[in-house]
């Protein structure tokens, strides 16, 4: 009987301790609400030079002609994360785009054929095509050097259906 009582006391204390810890954690997270914390961030080395070269070459979004440098994105055709060191800095692996078109391209909703004609994913419905100013007659200027990257994008990133 005394053994049972000891076990019950241990269990009771354990349960109380658990409740106190949860309460402590809740209090701590409430105190953190709206606060900031430091984070380690990976930075793409030479991305600024890559962007600068694309801005100097194209001067505007290759699809919609937005030309405010502050709004333009240096978009890798073959994604940066899987490009080798040379491909990451190769200007032929880049297109200059506004943020909306860059996001569509990065997510595979648009791509291009070897002549630069736009390919539009069936997943991009008519309303979003209209809102994003995407039409099947769009065409970008591409060079022979762009084609290997465009082919990669079309095969590995583009969502056809």
PLM-predicted stretches and their roles:
Residues 60:
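Ligand/cofactor pocket segment of small-molecule handling proteins
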Residues 1-52, 65-72:
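A short mid-domain helix/strand-loop element embedded in enzyme catalytic domains
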Residues 76:
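Conserved active-site aspartate in kinases
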Residues 39, 45, 49, 57, ...:
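A detector for short metal-coordination/catalytic motifs
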